[in-house]
Design a protein with these regions (language model features):
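HTH-adjacent hinge/linker in prokaryotic transcriptional regulators
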Residues: 3-71
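Glycine-rich beta-alpha loop segments
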Residues: 60, 69-84
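Glycine-rich phosphate-binding loops that contact phosphosugars or nucleotide phosphates
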Residues: 78-183
Length: 183
């Protein structure tokens, strides 16, 4: 059991109970995704697909509003506003989200860099000058990108601030996050 506790702590959890809750939540989220797909495919009458999808989105937005840690959100906003350079990392299915965020941040901030990559070495080449005055925004959802994790680890090692956009407070992406809930 002590090996399991050490493993959980090595992953960034306070202990085994927190790790267990995160695993349970991840399994629930995946099952819910499968269930939602099964429900939508062939079970929603043709004329109600749009309404069903939009209603689902409305419910998710309401849940986010209820669950978001507002102080963590404010810290993230302040961190972005005070950063010298903003790096945005989103790989594979998260690349369009990173591109969207970078596009609009370019209109507001003087130095925004979308880290585009096919390999871990490219990430480090694009982030080589990152310092404690900078921020990295990492975007990843299940199945979490190891390259994004490596980018956040590298940024953290260089004392840059890390902000994550992910699916859960228990996401492994939050290991290096500077703006965690409750902190």
């Amino acid at each position: 059991e002590s090996t399991t506790v050490r493993f959980a702590m090595q992953l960034g959890y306070a202990g085994y109970p927190e790790f267990q809750r995160a695993l349970e939540e991840m399994v629930m989220n995946r099952l819910n995704s499968v269930q939602r797909m099964q429900f939508t495919y062939g079970r929603v009458p043709q004329g109600e697909i749009l309404e069903t999808v939009l209603q689902s989105d409305i419910e998710k937005i309401k849940m986010t509003l209820e669950e978001v840690d507002r102080s963590a959100f404010e810290r993230a906003a302040d961190t972005i506003l005070s950063a010298r350079t903003i790096y945005i990392v989103g790989i594979r299915s998260c690349a369009p989200l990173a591109s969207f965020l970078a596009f609009y941040f370019h209109m507001i901030f003087p130095d925004v860099r979308q880290v585009q990559t096919n390999s871990s070495s490219e990430i480090f080449e694009q982030m080589i000058r990152i310092t404690e005055d900078d921020v990295v925004i990492g975007i990843s959802f299940p199945r979490y990108s190891m390259r994004t994790m490596k980018a956040l680890e590298f940024a953290n090692s260089r004392k840059a601030k890390v902000i994550t956009i992910t699916d859960s407070v228990h996401s492994p992406m939050n290991v290096y996050a500077a703006c965690k809930a409750g902190r």
